Amino acid sequence: MKNPSVISFLIILLFAATICTHGNEPVKDTAGNPLNTREQYFIQPVKTESKNGGGLVPAAITVLPFCPLGITQTLLPYQPGLPVSFVLALGVGSTVMTSSAVNIEFKSNIWPFCKEFSKFWEVDDSSSAPKEPSILIGGKMGDRNSSFKIEKAGEGARANVYKLTTFYGTVGAIPGVWLSAPQLIITKDTAKTLLVKFKKVDDATTATSNLYFPG
């Protein structure tokens, strides 16, 4: 028989998860289906005049050193990006909800560079980080700087458009060092906010299988 204190803790955890998700709604992919932690997705910026490329990929954001990698939008419109999966912070359920903490991890069997780093996203919260810190690869589940939230950013025809937020600010994009490919950063400037959609990998016709270095 399980210890009563353990059972009480599990009940409290489930109750807390219910409270945290009350009033939230499932995040939808481009087909209108809820995001599921068992599936993989391409994160694709909404196309604009200044952002007409493909999906998000890990890439070097400095000339030297290359590591840790950052995240950029591929300049090639036909490249869907590199797949990601989502891990719920509370570990309860499998549907990704708006305003709920998640960890984001790139999924790839081919990872030729920076193998000493994890594939989880994180905010550069180091003392040397600029005012608008970069999103890097090398995060750790449970760490404050590896926690992201998906917030609704569109209605009507743009109902399945979202933005990513963190404890430090909103995920945005600025011209990067390689051919000015949009690079992900944290910003409080709404003009730089990156609007994205999620495309299930099974629904895509092609996939990026290698790390992408603009240039």
Swiss-Prot record:
SUPFAM superfamilies found in the cross-reference section: STI-like
Oxidoreductase among keywords: no
Disruption phenotype: No visible phenotype under normal growth conditions.
Any Pfam family: Kunitz_legume
UniProt keyword Metal-binding, yes or no: no
Organism field: Arabidopsis thaliana (Mouse-ear cress)
Sites where a glycan is attached: 145
Assembly and oligomerization: Interacts with RD21A. Interacts with RD21B and RD21C.
Molecular-function annotations in GO: cysteine-type endopeptidase inhibitor activity; peptidase inhibitor activity
Localization per Swiss-Prot or TrEMBL: Secreted, Cell wall; Secreted, Extracellular space, Apoplast; Endoplasmic reticulum
Functional note: Water-soluble and chlorophyll-binding protein that probably does not function as a chloroplast chlorophyll carrier and is not involved in photosynthesis. Involved in the control of cell death in the transmitting tract and septum epidermis during flower development. Binds and inhibits the activity of the cysteine protease RD21A as a pro-death protein. May play a role in herbivore resistance activation during seedling greening.
Matches recorded under PANTHER family: KUNITZ TRYPSIN INHIBITOR 2
Tissue expression summary: Expressed in vascular bundles of the carpels, the transmitting tract of the style and septum epidermis. Expressed in etiolated seedlings.
GO cellular component: apoplast; endoplasmic reticulum
Family: Belongs to the protease inhibitor I3 (leguminous Kunitz-type inhibitor) family.
Cystine crosslinks: 67-114
Signal peptide as annotated in the record: 1-23
GO biological-process terms attached to the record: defense response; programmed cell death involved in cell development; regulation of pollen tube growth; response to herbivore; response to insect; response to wounding
Descriptive protein name: Kunitz trypsin inhibitor 2
Superkingdom of the source species: Eukaryota
Keywords on record: Apoplast, Cell wall, Disulfide bond, Endoplasmic reticulum, Glycoprotein, Plant defense, Protease inhibitor, Secreted, Signal, Thiol protease inhibitor
